[in-house]
Amino acid sequence: MQNPVIILGAQELGILALDAFQSNDVVVYCFLDDQVALQQKEVNDITVMGNTEDENFLKLLGKKCDVFVAAEDTAARKSLTKMLKDEYKVVPVNAIHKFSYVSEHAWLGHGNSVQAGAVINSNAKVGDSCVIGPRAVIDANAVLEDHVQLGAGAMVNAGVTIAEGAFIGTGAVVVSGVKIGKNARVGAGAVVVADVAAKQTVFGNPAKPV
């Protein structure tokens, strides 16, 4: 990556993306954020120049700058990513921390946040706009569809499939071969030994619906 990056979102996910880019000596041009209180202020020495629809900066995309979408809300990330594709014909780059590990035989889509210490092993597949927290592990042949979030230290074992929009909490373990449904939620520290239905929330060891 040679172009500077504009980060859409200057809160927690944006700060982690900044850290990932800077760990690889990638220049971050600026933040854009819709929270007025942040605008024209610095976040970790990078200025929040305007809002996420500011054409003065978005017109640079694809020519002079790349972009990463770091909105905190999944729906907002989806909306911003669609806007970038439809109006500016660009897709977000990945923010992969220098101290993560991504196998050369893994497959990643666009706009993913892969944080420090995360591991993505051989033949794993990660879709678009996923958030892989620090020290989270995606083992061989596991599949994460778009917009999946893994908390810090989550363990996704071999052959697991996690559908779009699902959330796996901090330190949770998903046992090999399990399927997690669309928009399901797995609580922190849970051990998932059976499939989880779409939109279901599970907690505990073994994980059970709540």
Predicted features by range, described:
Residues 1-52, 56-59:
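Hydrophobic, well-ordered beta-alpha structural blocks that scaffold small-molecule cofactor pockets
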Residues 15-19, 78, 194:
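Alpha-helical elements of the RecA-like P-loop NTPase motor core of helicases
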Residues 19, 82, 190:
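Active-site phosphate/pyrophosphate- and oxyanion-stabilizing loops and adjacent acidic/basic residues
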Residues 39-101:
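Phosphate-bearing ligand-interacting subdomains
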Residues 94-210:
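Structural signal for interior beta-strand "rungs" in well-ordered beta-sheet cores
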